[in-house]
């Protein structure tokens, strides 16, 4: 056989094997209605017992809390306490169109999107619904940057990490259909040098790719709440409208979390205790988790004492090292209407991550979408090009606005661009956006045939015309900054937690959510946090199994001595 023929056969076999591997790793969900089977074990907190006991009490039914609960329920009794409502109360969260709609709805204290303004003066939001932020976000799904694992302070089992991603993906992650504006965006990224072209991939790699979505191809949202369906319904109970006010501690043997106090929507107090070998696991998110620890007396001693909060354990870094990835952007108003699209195409570089989507016009500003309420609104269809600074290195802190009421959101400050490396990365990212705007792919969307970044009808602050003027770009970055809604930190591994996510100095208390790391794990982090809940759940099951085997071996040894 000729060498050329043999080479061709080997190439075909290689591609075939790669396809099989790819298909096996990325076994994704199929389009379906949002699965509410879990409603059979979900209750309003008013219907829960005033005092109950469980193996595990999970505070927060969000992006990490739901997969964590489902996993632990495979063997143990689990109670999930979620302060928000069921998604069925707000059907608009279940559609792609609902992303903007829910940001537009006034916050009445019950809506799934809770509004807050950081002390930086930037509008922001957090989830207040079962499923957490995974049910109000833009639906972008990606696996984490693999480089974060070695720097995390956690001894990861990478085979288990990958298996856990698949567990999530085969239920709520979809390969998106082709969308016209996303195709234009992909062409522009490649023309602007964001290489290589990865095609469709869930992996975080430098270059341009189509990534996964938690919106299926009918526009139905899928989210963390559906992962509850993978649990053991006989062992799992979910309480909504349950505001956890404090963690209960005992001192024998050693400082130990023994349960929580929570109130239902009528203001009635309830207590949920954990059984022997059980745990309280806080998954209330970057804002809610450090807030609850502080209210429970776990935090900086002098600070807690100044608020007359009894100090249970001095933990100086609770509420510290709070980060938020800045979002800077450009909006263009094309001369002709464009169809609305969700984000499915990503441009990944070392220092910044970028994407674009197209939208219909609106007359009510979506809260947090633009830097402030005074930002101009689009009167026609528009395209939004966003750049996210990786990391970031800048950080702030969280403090209590109320020393007794968990329903009062705390003060947060992120100190955007206080670290000049972040500012430099923003400048580089926005220059890349300038290169995108200068591509042939985007010429049809100009209103005038002008060179470079000129010729577009820009909504809001325009990019500097001179791509070499770093000072002008720095000013642009500071003046146009908004939140990417990817805030994180406040209860870091290595500062507050050990490598198994246990709060150091306290038995039977863990934290599993976005408060645990000082950097964003990917361009869009929900994939990592969904994985994290399942991963830690499996690790806990393994710990319990190993402990039980050790006890059994001890009993066998004792019995053999007697005999």
UniProtKB/Swiss-Prot annotation:
Any Pfam family: GMC_oxred_C
Highest taxon of the lineage: Eukaryota
Keywords of this entry: Disulfide bond, FAD, Flavoprotein, Glycoprotein, Lyase, Signal
Stretch forming the signal peptide: 1-27
InterPro entries: FAD/NAD-bd_sf (IPR036188), GMC_Oxidoreductase-Related (IPR051871), GMC_OxRdtase (IPR012132), GMC_OxRdtase_N (IPR000172), GMC_OxRtase_C (IPR007867)
Binding-site list for substrate: 355, 484
E.C. number: 4.1.2.10
Positions of disulphide bridges: 426-477
Residues at the active site: 486 (proton donor), 524 (proton acceptor)
Binding site for FAD: 63-64, 82-83, 129, 133, 137-140, 244, 485-486, 514, 525-526
Glycan-linked positions: 145, 162, 379, 419
Cofactor(s) demanded: FAD
Modification after translation, per record: Glycosylated. Deglycosylation does not affect the enzymatic activity.
pH-activity note: Optimum pH is 5.5.
Gene Ontology terms, MF aspect: flavin adenine dinucleotide binding; mandelonitrile lyase activity; oxidoreductase activity, acting on CH-OH group of donors
Catalytic function, reaction form: (R)-mandelonitrile = benzaldehyde + hydrogen cyanide
GO BP annotations, alphabetical order: nitrile metabolic process
Physiological role: Involved in cyanogenesis, the release of HCN from injured tissues. Catalyzes the stereospecific addition of HCN to a variety of aldehydes in vitro. Has no oxidase activity. The redox properties of the FAD cofactor appear to be unimportant for catalysis.
Assembly with partners or alone: Monomer.
Family: Belongs to the GMC oxidoreductase family.
Record protein name field: (R)-mandelonitrile lyase 2
